[in-house]
Amino acid sequence: MPVGGGSNLIVSDRPRTVAVSTSAFDLVEANGRKIYAGAGARLSKIMRTAEKNGLSGVEFWAGIPATFGGAVKMNAGAFSSETMDKVLYIDVLTGGKVKRLWKSGINYGYRHTETDGIILGGAIALEPSSPDAVRQKTREYLEKRRQTQPAGKSAGSVFKKVGGVGAGKYLDLAGLKGKRFGGAVVSEKHAGFFLNDGGATFEDFRRLADYAADKVWQKFGVKLEKEVVYFE
């Protein structure tokens, strides 16, 4: 299984799956209004390239500790923007050959992108701006994250939105803030995030997620779908 930065993965204490890192594919090149990035390029690196070249459009990535390949696969997003909004095409390895997939031919949606093969890289289209303006917008997004999201160890949002409503709202209303199993605990700051406050195991996290989803179902009749990926 190919993995990027692992920021949305919950890894088993005894995984049976072999992980293949894409970190070597970290090329980032700007060409006019476009930037090509390898699957292993950190979003922060792409953002620095965009800022340097006065290109705006991916400031919403600020604070997301992911690689480009992972962001494409999960269609990572924030602040009403998503990665696939900016993608022109992606290059994938399939059947031993490299194939270019243009966005018009890719099936994608909220927090998922279907790809026939392993993502190697891709191009994004941005808008002309200035380095100062891009830098300021990035700072604003970072500040919003600091104000609303916990700073502890987490894998990001555990569950996807439901009908445009953040799962954290349901978890909060279900009284789950502070609920824990072992070292895994629901954040007091934002119930959509589960924290590892020291020594949390894979089973701690899974039990907490299952418990939380069950409570929301019982109270609201709402079925939560995981945004994190279990790696077993």
Question: Which role does the model predict for each range below?
Answer:
Residues 29, 59, 91, 228-229:
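Residues embedded in well-ordered beta-strands within globular domains across many folds
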Residues 9, 93-232:
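Phosphate/pyrophosphate- and phosphate-bearing ligand-binding catalytic cores of soluble enzymes
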Residues 57-88, 154:
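A gly/ser-rich beta-alpha-beta helix-loop segment of oxidoreductase catalytic cores
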Residues 2, 83-85, 179:
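Short solvent-exposed loop/turn micro-motifs enriched in small/polar/acidic residues
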Residues 50, 68, 72-76, 91-94, ...:
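Short, well-ordered alpha-helical segments in soluble proteins
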Residues 10-27, 73-103, 116-121:
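Structural signature of FAD isoalloxazine-binding scaffolds in flavoprotein oxidoreductases
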Residues 1-68, 72:
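Anion-binding (especially nucleotide phosphate/pyrophosphate-binding) glycine-rich loop
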Residues 9-11, 45, 68-75, 82, ...:
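Basic, gly/Ser/Thr/Pro-rich low-complexity segments located predominantly at protein N termini
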